Amino acid sequence: TILLVPLVVYYAYDLPDISNLEQNNTKSTIMVMAQNGDVISTYGNVYGEWLDYQEIPINHIEAVIAIEDKRFFDHSGLDLRGLARAIVSNLIAGRMVEGGSTISQQLAKNLYLSAERTFKRKVQELLLSFWLEMKLSKQEILAVYLNRAYFGSGAYGIDAASRTIFGHSA
């Protein structure tokens, strides 16, 4: 552990700039529209309207928590039980079948880090998740996560996913 502390300090020093949480890092979407304004087709990723926590349907919130981080409201960015469960499941399977990252860790990675699987990135993800947990309420973390997470079919955010999959806003 004595060697781990300087390494964590070095990784903390090398963190990305996190001063502007609200910064928009989204890529452009190209929309082809008819003369009457109807969208004919879209190219690239789709981003929906930003929804505040109270605007997001409770069943969406509960579903994401149930799937991604059952103890979200009980931890401070790291879920040791969830991490241990994932390690055991992966060892039994002999491959990666389950992740142990919390919603806060996933948000830290999605907002600030690359998807590379390195020890450095994992330490930075953990440090950033602690920072998010100190800076934001659980509801704010969920709102940012649900507005920025990838839901498939090129849809980023719960509103874009709802529009893409169901044809209406969340």
Regions found by a protein language model. Give the residues of each.
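Juxtamembrane regions of bacterial inner-membrane/periplasmic proteins
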Residues: 1-170
